[in-house]
């Protein structure tokens, strides 16, 4: 533990178009090599594609997708008496959102498709419909936590 005080977390500013902090955080996850304007162009393009295909508000689709992707439980390795146990722990709200956004971007990149705009739009729409790689990752994470329920008393 550091002796000095902890560093204050930087506040994320809402994006100019949708006035949403979630959109800014998603753009930051998409960003590679500090190219934020490129990341924002990809994200806004994907949200436009979602609007065209679903005829719904893209923010509602994104919120639904994020809700279906955010994990409630995860496992953490805990060493007890020479053995490593996978201990299920609850995920804090901030980390839930971060993991959800990270998984959406990760599985968007792994999709087959022409452009990142189409891949991201497809993954968000799939997640909103409870399908896709990011939702599968959440379910796998929950299964791991469920399988290791016996070690829950090792929580710290």
Curated annotation (Swiss-Prot):
Keywords: Ribonucleoprotein, Ribosomal protein, RNA-binding, rRNA-binding, tRNA-binding. One of its GO terms (cellular component) is small ribosomal subunit. One of its GO terms (biological process) is translation. One of its GO terms (molecular function) is rRNA binding. It comes from the Bacteria. Disulfide bonds: none annotated. InterPro entries: Ribosomal_uS7, Ribosomal_uS7_bac/org-type, Ribosomal_uS7_CS, Ribosomal_uS7_dom, Ribosomal_uS7_dom_sf. Belongs to the universal ribosomal protein uS7 family. One of the primary rRNA binding proteins, it binds directly to 16S rRNA where it nucleates assembly of the head domain of the 30S subunit. Is located at the subunit interface close to the decoding center, probably blocks exit of the E-site tRNA. Part of the 30S ribosomal subunit. Contacts proteins S9 and S11. This is Small ribosomal subunit protein uS7. It comes from Heliobacterium modesticaldum (strain ATCC 51547 / Ice1).
């Amino acid at each position: 533990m550091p002796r000095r005080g902890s560093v204050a977390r930087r506040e994320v500013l809402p994006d100019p178009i949708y006035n949403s902090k979630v959109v800014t955080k998603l753009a930051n996850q998409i960003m590679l090599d500090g190219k934020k304007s490129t990341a924002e162009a990809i994200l806004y393009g994907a949200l436009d594609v979602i609007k065209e295909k679903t005829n719904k508000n893209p923010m509602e689709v994104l919120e639904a997708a994020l809700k279906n992707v955010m994990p409630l439980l995860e496992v953490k390795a805990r060493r007890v008496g020479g053995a490593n146990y996978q201990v299920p722990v609850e995920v804090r709200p901030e980390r839930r959102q971060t993991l959800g956004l990270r998984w959406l971007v990760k599985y968007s990149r792994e999709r087959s498709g022409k452009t990142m705009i189409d891949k991201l739009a497809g993954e968000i729409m799939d997640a909103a419909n409870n399908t896709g790689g990011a939702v599968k990752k959440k379910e796998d994470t929950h299964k791991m936590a469920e399988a290791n329920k016996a070690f829950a008393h090792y929580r710290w």
